[in-house]
UniProtKB/Swiss-Prot annotation:
Induction: Expression is induced during host plant infection. Keywords: Host cytoplasm, Host nucleus, Hydrolase, Metal-binding, Secreted, Signal, Virulence. PANTHER family: DIPHOSPHOINOSITOL POLYPHOSPHATE PHOSPHOHYDROLASE, DIPHOSPHOINOSITOL-POLYPHOSPHATE DIPHOSPHATASE. Its EC number is 3.6.1.-. GO terms for molecular function: hydrolase activity; metal ion binding. Effector that enhances P.infestans colonization of Nicotiana benthamiana leaves. Its main location: secreted. In the N-terminal section; belongs to the RxLR effector family. In the C-terminal section; belongs to the Nudix hydrolase family. Residues 212-271 form the Nudix hydrolase domain. The keyword Signal applies. The lineage of its organism: Eukaryota, Sar, Stramenopiles, Oomycota, Peronosporales. Residues 1-18 form the signal peptide. This is RxLR effector protein PITG_15679.
Length: 271
């Protein structure tokens, strides 16, 4: 009888230990851990019921102190392992909740980033719209900065007016290339003698090889928004999309620096 009781108890303890040793499969299978937890808790209750049944059947009749101590030790071990599994599952559950909380904060972080970079987003949107508008006429629009695109957009608006009015520059007269500008507040205009271009090339200088000496200048400024702007001179024909740096030939008595400055005044002239 004692042998049968010991075998039955050993089998019971082994089943409980096997249940308690069930491998939780991590955060991705939290539901499986909960199922394991349910089984362990149920097994623990079954263990108590089984112990009570064995008591009724005369478990107290066991006289061996050694056997009694071994049985109690095994039961304590089962309870300890079950308790440890409960703590492990609960800890992983808290970890899952914590990670879920972190994921819940992601939209807030995205909103913060979007707010901080709102100016960049607006700039990208404006640039994209201008590139789409200007690409038909300027195949290099995609490579230009937003500031350059804005200038081209303004020029296109003026060009449309010039074409409608039939305005076209002429190099036959000293002032034939100049546009009539209505005076505005703060307007600065160079003296008239500097605003008239030389007609013809009689007074221009040539190199030893017979080629005409040319000058060009890069004129840049910052507008009210801090954007860089470069002075480009459009073609005398408003239907063309050519833009060049202020350039021209050297006149007699001029060096490259003086010739370049004169061209800027002649072709720019108004500030």
């Amino acid at each position: 009888m004692k042998v049968l009781q010991l075998i039955a108890l050993t089998a019971l303890v082994s089943s409980c230990v096997a249940a308690s040793a069930a491998d939780p499969s991590g955060l991705a299978k939290t539901k499986s851990d909960v199922d394991v937890l349910s089984r362990v808790l149920a097994d623990h209750e079954q263990t108590n019921r089984s112990l009570r049944r064995y008591d009724l059947e005369g478990l107290d009749s066991v006289n061996s102190n050694r056997e009694e101590r071994n049985s109690i030790t095994m039961v304590d071990d089962v309870v300890t392992k079950a308790s440890g599994l409960v703590d492990d599952v609960m800890g992983k559950t808290d970890d899952v909740v914590g990670k879920a909380g972190q994921f819940g904060k992601v939209p807030t972080k995205l909103r913060d980033v979007a707010t901080k970079n709102m100016d960049k987003i607006k700039e990208m949107t404006a640039r994209s719209a201008l590139v789409k508008t200007l690409t038909g006429r300027y195949d290099y629009a995609e490579k230009l900065s937003l500031s350059a695109l804005k200038q081209l957009d303004d020029i296109e608006k003026v060009r449309a007016v010039d074409i409608k009015k039939g305005i076209k520059g002429s190099k036959e007269t000293p002032d034939g290339m100049r546009r009539v500008i209505e005076p505005f507040e703060g307007m600065k205009v160079a003296p008239k003698k500097f605003l008239e271009s030389h007609v013809g090339r009689a007074d221009q200088r040539y190199g030893k090889d017979g080629s005409r000496l040319l000058s060009a200048n890069v004129v840049m400024r910052l507008n009210d928004k801090g954007e860089k702007q470069i002075l480009l001179i459009s073609s005398s024909n408003p239907k063309k999309g050519d833009f060049l740096l202020p350039k021209g030939g050297w006149d007699k008595g001029e060096d490259v620096k003086k010739a370049a400055l004169r061209e800027v005044i002649e072709e720019g002239g108004v500030r």
